[in-house]
Amino acid sequence: MEYKNTLLMPKTEFPMRGNLPKREPAMQEKWAEMNIYEKVQEHTKGRPLFVLHDGPPYANGDIHMGHALNKVLKDFIVRYKSMTGFCAPYVPGWDTHGLPIEQALTNKGVKRKEMTVAEFRKLCAEYAYEQVERQREQFKRLGVRADWDNPYITLEPAYEAQQIKVFGDMAKKGYIYKGQKPVYWSPTSESALAEAEIEYQDKKSASIYVAFPVKDGKNVLEGDEKYIIWTTTPWTLPANLGISVHPELEYAIVKVNDEKYIIASELFETVAKTLEWENAEVVKTVKGSELEYTVAKHPFYDRDSLVMLGDHVTTDAGTGCVHTAPGHGEDDFIVGKKYGLEVLCPVDDKGVLTEEAPGFEGLFYDKANKPITEKLEEVGALLKLTFITHSYPHDWRTKKPIIFRATAQWFASIEAFRKELLEAVAETKWVPAWGETRLHNMVRDRGDWCISRQRAWGVPIPVFYAENGDPIITDETINHVADLFREHGSNVWFEREAKDLLPEGFTHPGSPNGEFRKETDIMDVWFDSGSSHQAVLEERDDLQRPADLYLEGSDQYRGWFNSSLSTAVAVTGKAPYKGVLSHGFVLDGEGRKMSKSIGNIVVPKKIMDQLGGDILRLWVSSVDYQSDVRISDDILKQVAEVYRKIRNTFRFLLGNLDDFKPSENTVAVAELREVDRYMLVKLNDLITKVKEAYETYDFAAVYHAIHNFCTIDLSSFYLDFAKDILYIEGANHEDRRAIQTVLYDVLVALTKLVTPILPHTADEVWPYIPGVTEESVQLTDMPEAVQLDDAEALKTKWDAFMTLRDDVLKALEVARNEKVIGKSLNASITLYPTAEMKAMLESINEDLKQLFIVSEYKLGGMMEEAPADAPKYEHTAVVVAQATGETCERCWVVSETIGKDAEHETLCERCATVVKENYVK
C-alpha cells in the first residue's frame, strides 16, 4: 500500500499566497454588499458609546502617507472598541474651504475675475466634492471601516448653519470683536493668517544697526547722544514711531571717538565687537525706566521717535533698544497703544509700500530693504550692515515669507476665557503626556485669535453694518442667517443684498433710512473645523460631545486641537474631548522629510497596489507612531515577511483542523496533557498582553506579541513537535484531538486579535474556521483570557523545560555541523542535567523524544557525571549520537522496531499499529 496516503497531512483551501492587491478589493466589495458598517453598529447597539471624532483632512489631492498613518491608527482603535463591549461609530469628515482650493482652480485656468464671487464659489464647491470622492475611495482601499455614505463635510449647509451658531454664541458672550491690530499677513495670499497657518523656514535677511539721534533728553540725557537699534526688517523703518527700552535694565552712554551712543550695559562687549569700536568708554549709566519719554529723531523723516518702556525687550540679541513700529508687530502695537501712538501701516494688501512711506512708495516690501538701507547710509545713520540666515515665518500654503501688518480684522478674544481653557487642558488625558504641556503653553501664551480672512471660499462672517458703521450681531440676525444657510448654503450671502439676508422688517437705530451692508470677510478655516464638536458631535444622534478621543498629527496642537478647544470652551465651558492622542510625521528610510525635490515620496496607493492594504496597516502597527516614523522599500519588505509568517501560521492551523468538529472532537481542558495546557497558558498570556496593548494604544506591542507568538511559541515549538502526532497518529487518537483542541482555540483567538490590524486577512480566514456561524469576524468580540487553575505551576515547569530545550537545540546544531547527524530525527540524545532540571524532566509524562524531535532520548546521570567530551550548556550536558536502527518509511523516525510486523516491513511498530487500526480493512 502507499503509506503516504495514510498520513493526515494538512488540508485547506485557504491560499498560501496573500495576493492582497487583488483579493482585498473583492473583500471590500463583500463588506459593502453586506453593509458591514451598519451591521457592526446594529450588533453593538445599546452598548456604551465610544466616540473617536475624525479630524477632517483637507479635500485636495491624493492621500499621502500621513493621511494613511492617521486613518489606520483611528481604524485600529474603532475596530478594537467595537469588539470589546462598546458601540464605536466612526463618522469621517472633510475640511473643504480655504485657499488651496481657490489656487487649484486658478491653476486649472479658471478666470475668477470674469465671474461673480457666487459663481466662483460654486466651482470651488464642485472641486471640493470631487476631491472628497477621490480621497474617500482611497481611504476605503486602506480597509478603514466608517460611515462612508454619511460623512460630515464642512461646506454642507447643515454644517455651516451650526458654525454660524457657534460664532453667534461667542459673539453673544462678548468674545468676538473687530479691531485694528498687527496680524500675520501673507502678501502672496493677500489675506490674514492664523498661527496655525504659519511654518518656519530659513530666510536670508539684512541685519542692520541704526542710529537715532536724541532730540529731547528730558534732563536725563544731554541731547548729543544717539540710540542704537538693531533690525532684520529695514522695510519697517518708515513705520517707526518709537524706541522701546526695558525698565529694569541698565543702559550705558558709550563714548566712541566724538560720538555718544546708548545701548544696554550688558550688551556693551557684543555691540562693541560687532560695530568694531576702538577705545570705547562708558561715560554714564542710567536705568531704563529713567529714559521713558525721552525723544529721538527718526533717521530720515522729520518725525519724533518716542522712547517707551516695554517688558518685551530682551538682551538675547541686538542692543537693548528696540525699533518700535505699532503697525508691524504685536509687542510694538501693545506698547504703542499704551503710549497713545497711532497705528501706522504704510504697506498694502499686496505687500507694497504706500504713500505713507514717502520715497519708497510702490516698492514691494522686500525690494524696499536695499533703498532704505542706502538712505540710512546717505544720512549717516547706518552703523553696520551684514546678512544673516534665520528662521522666519512663511505662509504654509504659498511657502513665501509673511509680514506683520496692522489691519482691521475680526478677533476671538482668548483672554476672556483663557483660565477656562487652561482648566480644560488639565482635565484632558494626553497621549503622549507631553501633549498637555505643549497645549498648555500655547494657550497660555497665545494672543487673541484673528478669525477673519480676505478671501472668497469660506463661511462668511455673519455681521451686518448699520449706516453709521455699527456692526450688528444679534440673536435674531444670527438665527436668521443660520436658517438661510441651512436652507440654501452659505452662497446665499454672496447672491443676495444685505437687506434680503436680514429678517423681514428688521430695523436698527444706526440705520434711520433702513440701509445696511454686509461683511465681506470669511472665517478662518480653523473656525470651520474647530466647530465640528457642535456641527457633528452634538448634532448627530449616533455621536456625543465630548468625544472620547481626538487623534491627529502633532502639528494639530496649534491647529485642530487648539481651535476645537477654543470654540468648545467658549460655547460650552468644557473641552470637546476627554482624551487626545497625537502621532508623528512619516519620513523616508533615512529619516528625511519627504519631498518632490529629493524624490523620496512614498505613496499609499503604490504600496497597496504592490503589496496590499494589510501590509501597509501592519507597518503602521509596527512603528512607534508617537514619534516620527520611517518607511522605505526595505522596511516594507521586512513587514511583508512578518505578514507571510502570520499568514502561514493561519494556513497551518486551518490545514490541521480540516477534520476537526468543535462540537464533537473537543477535549476537555482537564483531560489535556500538560504541554497542551501550557500552550493554552501561553495563549491566555497573549490575549491579556494584546488586549492591554490595544487599551493603551500601544500597537507596536500588539505587533511584536503576535509575531513572537507565531514564530517562537507556535512555529518553533508547539507546531513543530505536534506534526509527529497530527500527521502520524490515527484521526481520533487522543493526543491528536487534544492538540487540535488547542490549535482551534489558538486559531479563533488569533483571528480575532489581528482583526483590528489585518481586517482583510482576518475576514478571509474566518469562514474557513470549523463551526463559526458569524458572517464576519467583525461581528464577534475579542477573546477572553481563561485562567487555568494550575497556570503558574505549568509556567514555572514548562518555561524551565523551554530553556533546557534551547540547550538541546544548540547541541543538535553542533552535531549537525560536525556531520554526526543529518537532521534531528537521526539523533539519539543523552542528557546530564542539573539536579533541578533532572527532577523536572522526570516529572514529564509526555514523550520527550517527541518534544525534542529526536528518535531516541535517554536521561543519564547528573551534569558532573557527563563524559568529559560531552558539550556542557547552562542547564545540561548533551551527548548526541546517531540513533540505532533503520528509518521508518512513514514517520521518518529511526527505530530498532522496523520490520517487526511482517505485513509492514518498512514501518516502525507504532506506524504498523496505526495503519492496521485505521487503514487496513
Curated annotation (Swiss-Prot):
<dbReference type="InterPro" id="IPR013155">
    <property type="entry name" value="M/V/L/I-tRNA-synth_anticd-bd"/>
</dbReference>
<dbReference type="GO" id="GO:0006428">
    <property type="term" value="P:isoleucyl-tRNA aminoacylation"/>
</dbReference>
<dbReference type="Pfam" id="PF06827">
    <property type="entry name" value="zf-FPG_IleRS"/>
</dbReference>
<dbReference type="InterPro" id="IPR009008">
    <property type="entry name" value="Val/Leu/Ile-tRNA-synth_edit"/>
</dbReference>
<keyword id="KW-0862">Zinc</keyword>
<feature type="short sequence motif" description="'HIGH' region">
    <location>
        <begin position="57"/>
        <end position="67"/>
    </location>
</feature>
<comment type="function">
    <text>Catalyzes the attachment of isoleucine to tRNA(Ile). As IleRS can inadvertently accommodate and process structurally similar amino acids such as valine, to avoid such errors it has two additional distinct tRNA(Ile)-dependent editing activities. One activity is designated as 'pretransfer' editing and involves the hydrolysis of activated Val-AMP. The other activity is designated 'posttransfer' editing and involves deacylation of mischarged Val-tRNA(Ile).</text>
</comment>
<feature type="binding site">
    <location>
        <position position="908"/>
    </location>
    <ligand>
        <name>Zn(2+)</name>
    </ligand>
</feature>
<dbReference type="InterPro" id="IPR010663">
    <property type="entry name" value="Znf_FPG/IleRS"/>
</dbReference>
<dbReference type="InterPro" id="IPR050081">
    <property type="entry name" value="Ile-tRNA_ligase"/>
</dbReference>
<dbReference type="GO" id="GO:0005524">
    <property type="term" value="F:ATP binding"/>
</dbReference>
<comment type="subunit">
    <text>Monomer.</text>
</comment>
<keyword id="KW-0436">Ligase</keyword>
<comment type="similarity">
    <text>Belongs to the class-I aminoacyl-tRNA synthetase family. IleS type 1 subfamily.</text>
</comment>
<keyword id="KW-0479">Metal-binding</keyword>
<keyword id="KW-0648">Protein biosynthesis</keyword>
<keyword id="KW-0030">Aminoacyl-tRNA synthetase</keyword>
<keyword id="KW-0963">Cytoplasm</keyword>
<dbReference type="InterPro" id="IPR023585">
    <property type="entry name" value="Ile-tRNA-ligase_type1"/>
</dbReference>
<feature type="binding site">
    <location>
        <position position="552"/>
    </location>
    <ligand>
        <name>L-isoleucyl-5'-AMP</name>
    </ligand>
</feature>
<keyword id="KW-0547">Nucleotide-binding</keyword>
<feature type="binding site">
    <location>
        <position position="911"/>
    </location>
    <ligand>
        <name>Zn(2+)</name>
    </ligand>
</feature>
<dbReference type="InterPro" id="IPR002300">
    <property type="entry name" value="aa-tRNA-synth_Ia"/>
</dbReference>
<dbReference type="InterPro" id="IPR014729">
    <property type="entry name" value="Rossmann-like_a/b/a_fold"/>
</dbReference>
<keyword id="KW-0067">ATP-binding</keyword>
<dbReference type="GO" id="GO:0008270">
    <property type="term" value="F:zinc ion binding"/>
</dbReference>
<dbReference type="InterPro" id="IPR001412">
    <property type="entry name" value="aa-tRNA-synth_I_CS"/>
</dbReference>
<dbReference type="GO" id="GO:0000049">
    <property type="term" value="F:tRNA binding"/>
</dbReference>
<dbReference type="GO" id="GO:0002161">
    <property type="term" value="F:aminoacyl-tRNA deacylase activity"/>
</dbReference>
<dbReference type="GO" id="GO:0005829">
    <property type="term" value="C:cytosol"/>
</dbReference>
<dbReference type="InterPro" id="IPR009080">
    <property type="entry name" value="tRNAsynth_Ia_anticodon-bd"/>
</dbReference>
<dbReference type="InterPro" id="IPR033708">
    <property type="entry name" value="Anticodon_Ile_BEm"/>
</dbReference>
<dbReference type="InterPro" id="IPR002301">
    <property type="entry name" value="Ile-tRNA-ligase"/>
</dbReference>
<protein>
    <recommendedName>
        <fullName>Isoleucine--tRNA ligase</fullName>
        <ecNumber>6.1.1.5</ecNumber>
    </recommendedName>
</protein>
<dbReference type="Pfam" id="PF00133">
    <property type="entry name" value="tRNA-synt_1"/>
</dbReference>
<dbReference type="GO" id="GO:0004822">
    <property type="term" value="F:isoleucine-tRNA ligase activity"/>
</dbReference>
<feature type="binding site">
    <location>
        <position position="891"/>
    </location>
    <ligand>
        <name>Zn(2+)</name>
    </ligand>
</feature>
<dbReference type="Pfam" id="PF08264">
    <property type="entry name" value="Anticodon_1"/>
</dbReference>
<feature type="binding site">
    <location>
        <position position="888"/>
    </location>
    <ligand>
        <name>Zn(2+)</name>
    </ligand>
</feature>
<feature type="binding site">
    <location>
        <position position="596"/>
    </location>
    <ligand>
        <name>ATP</name>
    </ligand>
</feature>
<feature type="short sequence motif" description="'KMSKS' region">
    <location>
        <begin position="593"/>
        <end position="597"/>
    </location>
</feature>
